[in-house]
Amino acid sequence: MAMKRVGHLCLLQIKELLRNPTFYAYLCLFFVYYHYLADGTVRLQQESGLWVNAWGYAAGVFSNYQSTLALGLGAVMLFSDLPLVREYALFEATRCSRNTWIGGRILYVGMVSVLYASLLLLLCAFTSRGRLMETSEWGKLLNTLANGYGFGEYHVPVSLSLEVTQNLTPLAAFGLTVLMSALATAAMGLMMLCLSLIVGRIGAIAAGCMVAVLDFVIYQKLPFWCYWLSPLSFTRLSIVYCPKMPYYPTWQQALVLLLVCNALCMLLAFGLAHCNRAFAKGICKEQY
């Protein structure tokens, strides 16, 4: 019965998200962004007569720090209402147990993270106008980029290495990127959930923004070992699938770290829900 209530609370929040026009406005912005990124790739395919693998292209684009920045900032916007304590939250919190209340929000973060990561990568793949039916061959264009060559005036925002193209199929690279992106997004959402119960919504959003831009700051200014501190950096195959760089985390290490981070944030959220003063203060502050 408790799990049924948790699922019911999660579905209520998902329905509220899908009824919110801002959600669709963000999706349209992402579509325009990925369409703009793919402009050089589309022209290159049209003028060369060669094709790009859509799945491999999406994985390569998400290996770029610019797409990682967009992914992180989009996650902050997506979870900016956590812990969703407005409107019906006070009623929900008094009618069900605290474990059920916080469990519904944790389940919501997990499901929305998978949906969010999958939608963005699919948008990226579809806007490339590449081949969707080919799942095993990277194609000449992506293999050329993986070997370190460019295409002159054609800007193809793909970051791939030979290790990726030699050891993974395009569909496997796409699936691994979806998995890591969903886990990183969930870690951000759970962190914002905990912080919103401790310091309020503004503090949670500020912390989320700092995590979102950390990968970009590391790329520009900080030593590369700092990638271990950025969960969004684990979504980039150019980092987690680069054995030549010993100070980069491997994808296995990144996967374990993301799972541990999510587990710790869930335990902290349950702990905060059982802190009488903190829980009641957070609920009433946002409600009134």
Predicted region positions:
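Central hydrophobic cores of alpha-helical transmembrane segments
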Residues: 27-31, 203-216, 284-287
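Juxtamembrane membrane-interface segments at transmembrane alpha-helix termini
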Residues: 41-42, 217-225
